[in-house]
A protein has these predicted regions:
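Catalytic glycan-binding domains that act on GlcNAc-containing polysaccharides
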Residues: 3-129
Length: 129
């Protein structure tokens, strides 16, 4: 394998995240994000390891209009997934991502997902990126 064991480990999806695959797949389809199910599960893995009531850590995102916009404000995993998918789709669109193989744009979108897409892209624009 071209990756060291350590990197491979970091990219593995645990059982808790894998258990959400069907739900993530069906929700992703509603937002034309079916090609990104593995990426979405990787985001979930990174954000929460599939634990808790806000597995996508999307409480503070723009799409959360039902729960407090504070860490772990969302108490419904399904709603967290829906918000997280919309947030990532928005970030991918803003990054100009052309598809699941456009890794440089995906990296940009993932950074935007973490920092909040609008403020992140505004920051890049202001700093000439």
């Amino acid at each position: 394998s071209k990756f060291s064991g350590r990197q491979e480990e970091a990219h593995q999806i645990n059982a808790a995240c894998e258990a959400y695959r069907d739900e993530v797949s069906s929700e992703a389809a509603q937002y034309d994000m079916s090609d990104y199910v593995d990426l979405l599960l990787a985001v979930m893995m990174q954000e929460s390891s599939g634990q808790g009531t806000d597995p996508m850590q999307s409480s503070e995102g723009a799409y959360n209009t039902r729960y407090p916009q504070q860490p772990n404000g969302i108490t419904d995993p399904s709603y967290s997934i829906s918000c997280g998918i919309q947030e990532l789709k928005y970030a991918l669109d803003k990054a100009g991502c052309t598809g699941p193989t456009d890794l440089s744009k995906i990296r940009l979108a993932l950074q935007a997902y973490n920092f909040g897409a609008d403020s992140y892209f505004a920051y890049l624009e202001e700093n000439g990126h």
